[in-house]
Amino acid sequence: MAERLIIVSDMWGSKRGLWITSYLGYLQQYFDITYHDSQQLANLDVKVHTGENIHRAFVEGGIDTAVAHLMKKEQEPAHYLGFSTGGTIAWKASLMGLPMKSLYTVSSTRLRAEEKRPDCPITALYGDNDVYRPKTDWFKELNIKSELFKGFGHDMYTDEKIIGKVCLDLLKSVTQKPKKLHKIKVA
């Protein structure tokens, strides 16, 4: 039976999400995937769809609403992939008890304000041109595996090179068998 993968979109959701089809194309044959549009989880009703207005709506209660709705919709342990705001939503839901096997975030800059980490393996990717990414010390303090990509900004998750890397990482994480321990006889 395939592992479950829950994908939580960036703040744009399906409205600017053609890139998500590349992830689905790579991953759907290996995972049982559920996709959540962050705007729908947050019940956003923004009159003018600018980045600034959508961002403000998430910060002013939308993230909390999205966390509550994600927790109602997902109750079984699963792997999570979150893009930008979606990674923050998944992170906060895990801290509130959402069962999570692993969390893979890409460009989730709001995590820089978090002081506690979910109790699961975490991978966080950021572009080195993303000025709002967490500082290096944050990753060390929370013991988080991270990678920084040269020449990429916040929307790096829409780039085919990054899409391929993320998908390969996720596939490796669920297809690699644990290494066997060799017992040594002591005389």
Q: Whereabouts are the PLM-identified features?
A:
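Short, conserved loop/helix-junction motifs that constitute active-site signature segments
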Residues: G97-L98, R112-C120, F139-L142
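Conserved loop-alpha-helix segment in the C-terminal half of the alpha/beta-hydrolase fold
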Residues: R133-K145
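A conserved short beta-strand
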Residues: L98-R110
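Catalytic histidine-centered segment of alpha/beta-hydrolase-like enzymes
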Residues: G151-K161
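Short beta-strand/loop motif that positions the catalytic acidic residue
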Residues: A124-Y126
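Hydrolases whose catalytic domains are alpha/beta-hydrolase-1, hotdog thioesterase
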Residues: I89-A93, E114
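Gly/Ala-rich beta-loop-alpha elbow adjacent to hydrolase catalytic centers
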Residues: L81-A90
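Serine-hydrolase catalytic machinery in alpha/beta-hydrolase-like enzymes
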Residues: A2-K73
